[in-house]
Amino acid sequence: MQCEFKGVISALPTPYDQSQQIDMESLRKLIRFNIEQNIKGLYVGGSTGEAFLQNVAEREKILETVADESDGRLTLIAHVGGISTAESEVLAKAAKKYGYHAISAVTPFYYPFSFEEHCIHYRKIIDSADGLPMVVYNIPALSGVRFSLDQINELVTIPRVCALKQTSGDLFQMEQIKRNHPELVLYNGYDEIFASGLIAGADGGIGSTYNIMGWRYLEIFEAVKNNDVIKAKEMQVACNQVIDTLIQSGVLAGIKTLLYYMGIINTPVCRSPFSPVKEKNLDVLSKLAERLFEEHDRNKKMKII
């Protein structure tokens, strides 16, 4: 199945209030901030969105709110994955109801499912989505599910699978997948190797740090498209300096703290068992947020974004 969703797609965080309840006002502001950055698509309800710390009703409400706020301005991919096929089917139906362009699902994890069981799981979700294309989400480091290249080749040929989100540092495998399936849309998942992933054959990326500096990833995407490897490397290094700071503070909490300091969300809260950023890291993040927001404003005034 052909899929045209290429380029830079933000993996959307879920803002919470101080009671760890979903903050829909902040969610809407975050969507608008992505649009300001000239981001054209959102990946909703994935790892960055803390989906596995939410119940099905909450996940469905997020899908509804994002669709409402986006109002046709963005390509929307609904991550509906989880351990339970039945719950994923419910969310796939919701994605169809709210007008999403595609669904996505991580491989079911925790239990040692067979490859055949994984394939059945995906087919059932796809059938529930009533014609929506599927983006398979492969993230072996967190799911614990490690498919061979032959298994990936089989998985992406399931009817209505149109894309693969490949969150892996194995660039050789990424190149092999693209060579074997040139029609498949391939997304790079690790933000820190976005430029390298594009060179290896990715058609775009889905990432969490796009929310705080999406314009940089757009520059990388354009640079690689124009064969300007030096520019792409320069911008990737700039992104990786931010990512290095986030790793030291905790990536998800760090991203939310930056968004909080930038005035985009009302609190930097993640759901338990995630911890808040330690006080010793706050000053560094505050100064980084100021620099990023100033850079965003400059780009906006220069109409770069």
UniProtKB/Swiss-Prot annotation:
GO BP field: carbohydrate metabolic process; N-acetylneuraminate catabolic process
Compartments (UniProt record) = Cytoplasm
What this protein catalyses is: aceneuramate = aldehydo-N-acetyl-D-mannosamine + pyruvate
Pfam families documented for this protein = DHDPS (PF00701)
Which EC number(s) are documented for this chain? 4.1.3.3
Summarize subunit and interaction data from the UniProt record for this chain. Homotetramer.
Recall the GO molecular function terms of this protein's record.
N-acetylneuraminate lyase activity
Which Gene Ontology CC terms are recorded?
Answer: cytosol
* Broad EC category: lyase
**Protein name, as recorded:** N-acetylneuraminate lyase 2
* Residue numbers annotated as active site: 137, 165
Q: What PROSITE patterns does this protein map onto? A: DHDPS_1, DHDPS_2
Spell out the HAMAP family in the cross-references. N_acetylneuram_lyase
What the protein does comes down to:
Catalyzes the reversible aldol cleavage of N-acetylneuraminic acid (sialic acid; Neu5Ac) to form pyruvate and N-acetylmannosamine (ManNAc) via a Schiff base intermediate.
Keywords (A to Z) from UniProt: Carbohydrate metabolism, Cytoplasm, Lyase, Schiff base
Where does this protein act, in terms of pathway? Amino-sugar metabolism; N-acetylneuraminate degradation; D-fructose 6-phosphate from N-acetylneuraminate: step 1/5
User: Mind telling me which NCBIfam families this protein's record contains?
Assistant: nanA, PRK04147.1
Question: In which family does this protein belong, per the annotation?
Answer: Belongs to the DapA family. NanA subfamily.
What positions does the entry give for aceneuramate binding? 47-48, 167, 189, 191-192, 208
